[in-house]
Amino acid sequence: MTNQYSILFKQEQAHDDAIWSVAWETNKKENIETVVTGSLDDLVKVWKWRDERLELQWSLEGHQLGVVSVDISHTLPIAASSSLDAHIRLWDLENGKQMKSIDAGPVDAWTLAFSPDSQHLATGTHMGKVNIFGVESGKKEYSLDTRGKFILSIAYSPDGKYLASGAIDGIINIFDIATGKLLHTLEGHAMPIRSLTFSPDSQLLVTASDDGYIKIYDVQHANLAGTLSGHASWVLNVAFCPDDTHFVSSSSDKSVKVWDVGTRTCIHTFFDHQDQVWGVKYNGNGSKIVSVGDDQEIHVYDCPI
């Protein structure tokens, strides 16, 4: 427990190339903290966070090209990764073995995300569709069509009701998962949407864009609730804190920023990376933040809670 933000741990040379994606899952029952990273070196790495440091548990081979997105199931010991090789792979975190390889072609699967119940895996495509795969079956079950451009980012709402997608032209779409209907189209950004994240109560959607801005939307009414500036360049990733009151962002300006949702202000900036910071996540209780970037490093920060 701490009352200030500080860098706690640095894993240098964590991969042999840029690290573009990170996930952190806390297994509360067994008190296990798992971090998964995906890199342009074609590898997925599984780390355990214990005694205030990361320990490499598995280095997972299988992708033929760079890994651009990783996620960890909220209910099962499974990780998923998507790659420029147009395949999604599912990995067993208990033995480090590949469980499934899903052909997500014809071109590529960009961002992927597990549904809150971990029954499904959603991935954005270059054709403006979100493909939904069954985790058990490994098959495509249905698609949500934005009728738009290349989808760079997707997110499920924690209550399982909504799926949001962000496209290369700055358009954000929110779908009702139960009906598959498009609920809202938001046009708040004029440049690519690199990342989006719902608040834990599923009421707010935070978006990150190459225009340097972060926007906060009220999901139900599709109202813009705030525009935040502070990054000097592209905002590459955003992630909400489990406490509902903060979120974190990372940027090509090499910084990681923590924001207060209520006041819409930046309350802390970390300048520890040497290059663009592609991925950022909180752990299960919001006491830590992990970040990854082009400098091939993984950083873990302490947060006051």
Curated annotation (Swiss-Prot):
InterPro entries: G-protein_beta_WD-40_rep, SKI8, WD40/YVTN_repeat-like_dom_sf, WD40_repeat_CS, WD40_repeat_dom_sf, WD40_rpt
Protein's cellular compartments: Nucleus; Cytoplasm
Biological process according to GO: negative regulation of myeloid cell differentiation; nuclear-transcribed mRNA catabolic process, 3'-5' exonucleolytic nonsense-mediated decay; rescue of stalled ribosome; transcription elongation by RNA polymerase II; Wnt signaling pathway
Residues modified as N-acetylthreonine: 2
Residue positions, PTM N-acetylmethionine: 1
Keyword Cell membrane: no
Chief location: nucleus
WD repeats: 14-57, 62-101, 104-143, 146-187, 188-227, 230-269, 272-305
SUPFAM superfamilies: WD40 repeat-like
Superkingdom in the source lineage: Eukaryota
Keyword terms, alphabetized: Acetylation, Cytoplasm, Nucleus, Repeat, Transcription, Transcription regulation, WD repeat, Wnt signaling pathway
GO CC annotations on file: Cdc73/Paf1 complex; cytoplasm; euchromatin; nucleus; Ski complex
Gene3D superfamilies, per database record: YVTN repeat-like/Quinoprotein amine dehydrogenase
Family, per entry: Belongs to the SKI8 family.
Function summary: Component of the PAF1 complex (PAF1C) which has multiple functions during transcription by RNA polymerase II and is implicated in regulation of development and maintenance of embryonic stem cell pluripotency. PAF1C associates with RNA polymerase II through interaction with POLR2A CTD non-phosphorylated and 'Ser-2'- and 'Ser-5'-phosphorylated forms and is involved in transcriptional elongation, acting both independently and synergistically with TCEA1 and in cooperation with the DSIF complex and HTATSF1. PAF1C is required for transcription of Hox and Wnt target genes.
Quaternary context: Component of the PAF1 complex, which consists of CDC73, PAF1, LEO1, CTR9, RTF1 and SKIC8. The PAF1 complex interacts with PHF5A. Within the PAF1 complex interacts directly with PHF5A. Component of the SKI complex which consists of SKIC2, SKIC3 and SKIC8.
Protein's recorded name: Superkiller complex protein 8
Organism annotation: Rattus norvegicus (Rat)
Lineage of the species this protein comes from: Eukaryota, Metazoa, Chordata, Craniata, Vertebrata
